[in-house]
Amino acid sequence: MALTSSLGGAAVASEPTPLASTSDIQPVSHTVDKSQVSGSAASPLADKYVIAAPSKTGGFSTDSVIGADGRVRIINTTAAPNRSIVQIEFNGGYICSGALISDDTVLTAGHCVHEGGTGSTADYSWGVKVAPGRNGSTDPYGTCGATQLLTDQRWIDSANTNADWGVIKLDCTIGNTTGWLNYSGTTASLTGTSATVRGYPGDKAFGTMWSMTGAIESTQTEKVFYKMDTYGGQSGAPVYNSSNTIVAIHTNGGSSNSGTRITPTLANYLTSVK
């Protein structure tokens, strides 16, 4: 949830050796029980919106501003592609970011929809609320709830960072109003590609959208690494290229930030469920 973290030391200075991976995703789905009114969406790995100081839990760090903060605030959140970028809230005051990829489908991080590493279907997030193009206290397109949460069994079972992707199916078709972002799956190296990370960080005023553009520094089979500044709350934010096409999902922070890559297999799956 409100987590952009270092997950086992993601720092890279040069092209890393790819992690052992087959890129074979193992998708699973969970139907949201809207009668559930107690409990929290809190993951032990997540931070609440109000972050008094960069906290660390289980080796995860939420502080991923690298050097001087290069992020800029997006004031016009109703322009494209900003209106397709969403803030996600959960019970307990936890937040994430994401992007609409169809009229009723949001792409985000796996740890935004499930705690990860527990193997339990009881650890999906609760009280999901999605606000496209939010601008401070203003929700220009209103908010939507969730009907279904989807992620990867590898994330549920072992918190495999290669599988840290999530999908939220909405109870509305707001994307017909806002439009949505395209995505692209490729096995080619993305190193050197110009990319933007845009979302809702928890160290800024609530509901404000922030952005930074830079180069992808290195590529693995299912991950990309970059030094664009982020913070807890930007988990799930789209990492998109100059054509506004999503190439990764922001998930982790540290001396290098990183995201789960859109592989051809994941892209095909997203197309099947959106």
Q: For each predicted feature, which ranges?
A:
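C-terminal segment of classical bacterial N-terminal signal peptides
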Residues: L3-V12
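Protease-domain processing segments flanking chymotrypsin-fold serine proteases, especially trypsin-like
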Residues: A11-L100
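Catalytic histidine site
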Residues: A80-K129, A215-T219, T251-S255, G259-T260
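Solvent-exposed loop/turn segments at secondary-structure junctions
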Residues: G92-I95, V106, C112-E115, G136-T138, ...
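C-terminal cap/linker of serine protease catalytic domains
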Residues: V247, T251-K274
